[in-house]
Swiss-Prot record:
Lineage, highest ranks first: Eukaryota, Metazoa, Chordata, Cephalochordata, Leptocardii
Composition-biased stretches (Basic and acidic residues): 90-106
Species: Branchiostoma floridae
Matches recorded under PROSITE patterns: HOMEOBOX_1, HOMEOBOX_2
Location(s), subcellular: Nucleus
Protein family (similarity comment): Belongs to the distal-less homeobox family.
Keywords: Developmental protein, DNA-binding, Homeobox, Nucleus
The UniProt record lists the keyword DNA-binding: yes
Keyword Ubl conjugation in annotation: no
Name this polypeptide is given: Homeobox protein DLL homolog
Record-level GO cellular component terms: nucleus
């Protein structure tokens, strides 16, 4: 007798699979089950049960089923979906398969299988000019300022933010490599005249009468003789700034001055008069260097002619002293 076992099998199946909503919505007859079980006979398991013990494991239409077990999906779709219409089978089949491939538009993979970087933003010269100008004013932008600048330049706020981040990094890197800019060299003593320049007689630094001078600070040239300033042309004497030593020697020989010609003044300087001109002689300069026949240079000031002319007393008065 083969009929009783066939009648008991659908009853047990209906009891075991009564929890499926698909089976409840689509009732089938016993003849359909018989045809379905007859086709699934080669795939029968022990005890004549063609399915696994877990009713949710290989169900193609169940959302918790295994979508990757293609070997089990094929016989189940032939056995379980045999009584459904073609539209239901196609709908359940597509519902069971889940496509795990990402969207082709989101793929940024090059030929080596690595993720490609986003394309670099190319800024125009006008945009770079405005961005640099704003960076000079402030290195950090608030949200309203960033939105306003982005709308003004036709950029997104993200592009403006990234540009400022890169610019700050570059600025910090330059400051770390080059260090802080050197402080401006102050010139607090630039207004005070240099005593060496005063003694050398440079224009604009004339030494006042009676100011202390130090010949040791002067640069000696021409065999130990102090530098002489260019003398103003007077009485046919040649003017040559490079030949100061020859000019000093010629002046000493022409004047033929004596010790009586020297006159101490109140300002602590010694003055001598020659050819109607008044000259000053530093008290630190030895008198032997000022005598005729010596090649000593006598420091003078360039504006000596503008100074007040002192009237010397008669020679007889000097001899009495």
């Amino acid at each position: 007798m083969e009929i009783p076992p066939v009648q008991q099998t659908p009853v047990s199946m209906s009891m075991n699979h009564s929890s499926y909503p698909v089976r409840c919505l689509h009732p089938t007859s016993h003849t359909q089950h018989e045809s379905a079980f007859s086709t699934a006979a080669p795939h029968s398991r022990p005890l004549g049960y063609p399915f696994s013990m877990n009713p949710m494991a290989n169900h193609p239409g169940h959302p918790y089923g295994n979508p990757y077990s293609t070997a089990a999906v094929t016989p189940v779709s032939e056995s379980r979906l045999g009584g459904f219409s073609d539209d239901d089978n196609e709908r359940l089949y597509h519902f069971s398969r889940t496509d795990k491939s990402p969207d082709p538009t989101d793929q940024r993979i090059n030929g080596k299988g690595k993720k490609m970087r986003k394309p670099r933003t190319i800024y125009t010269s006008f945009q770079l000019q405005q961005l640099n100008r704003r960076f000079q004013r402030t290195q950090y932008l608030a949200l309203p300022e960033r939105a306003e600048l982005a709308a003004q330049l036709g950029l997104t706020q993200t592009q403006v933010k990234i540009w400022f981040q890169n610019r700050r990094s570059k600025y910090k890197k330059l400051m770390k490599q080059g260090g802080a800019p050197p402080p401006a060299v102050g010139t607090p003593n630039s207004s005070a005249p240099n005593p060496v320049q005063q003694q050398s007689g440079q224009p604009g630094h004339a030494s006042p009468p009676g100011a202390p001078t130090d010949l040791s600070d002067q640069q000696m040239s021409h065999g130990g003789q102090p530098n002489l300033p260019p003398r103003a042309p007077s009485q046919g004497q040649p003017q040559n700034g490079d030949d100061d030593a020859a000019w000093a020697a010629a002046t000493c020989h022409d004047q033929r001055r004596t010790n009586a010609d020297l006159l101490p003044t109140r300002m602590g300087r010694q003055q001598y008069q020659s050819h109607g001109e008044l000259h000053e002689l530093s008290p630190l300069l030895p008198l032997s260097m000022a005598l005729p026949g010596t090649a000593a240079a006598i420091p003078t000031t360039p504006n000596i002619e503008r100074q007040q002319q002192y009237v010397l007393p008669p020679v007889n008065f000097l001899q009495r002293l």
